[in-house]
């Protein structure tokens, strides 16, 4: 993760904007734009949902809502600080036993989204650790992973990203 964690938010946004532009240039329907990510990618989902106003839906699997203080130079605002800027419908999928993202942070994210009047749903899986969807790791939890994937697919269908 050192290389990924050294990427400034501005560069992340530029890369994702370029990806969207490329998809559009290839005939992709960017009016149905959605984003999904896991772990650091889940954090990126929350950040990009605030950056790209065309995004319809965002699904964050165990995305960090609060950044470590040491990252402030590269990541000036935590996802939770960007909540007022979010336009996309946000689905957050978290493990209750996540050692890196305490339930208290998930609750803070929920409160911020609710307080800002955002369209969102947060689901926390009892006993599931961080990485519960990674079937190549010991943290994999089949039942939670399958339900979370079904939730994500349904979310994208509900908000017009998938048909």
Give names to the regions the model predicted.
Residues 23, 27-38:
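Alpha/beta-hydrolase fold nucleophile elbow
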Residues 2-26:
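Alpha/beta-hydrolase active-site loop
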């Amino acid at each position: 993760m050192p290389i990924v964690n050294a990427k400034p938010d501005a560069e992340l946004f530029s890369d994702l904007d370029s990806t969207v532009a490329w998809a559009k240039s290839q005939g992709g329907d960017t009016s149905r734009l959605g984003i999904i990510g896991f772990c650091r990618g889940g954090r990126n989902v929350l950040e990009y949902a605030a950056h790209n106003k065309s995004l319809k839906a965002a699904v964050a699997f165990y995305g960090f809502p609060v950044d470590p203080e040491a990252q402030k130079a590269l990541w000036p605002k935590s996802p939770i600080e960007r909540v007022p800027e979010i336009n996309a419908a946000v689905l957050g999928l978290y493990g209750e036993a996540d050692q890196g993202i305490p339930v208290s942070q998930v609750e803070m994210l929920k409160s911020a989204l609710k307080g800002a009047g955002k369209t969102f749903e947060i689901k926390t899986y009892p006993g599931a650790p961080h990485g519960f969807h990674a079937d190549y790791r010991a943290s994999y939890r089949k039942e939670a992973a399958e339900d979370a994937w079904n939730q994500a697919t349904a979310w994208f269908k509900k908000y017009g990203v998938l048909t």
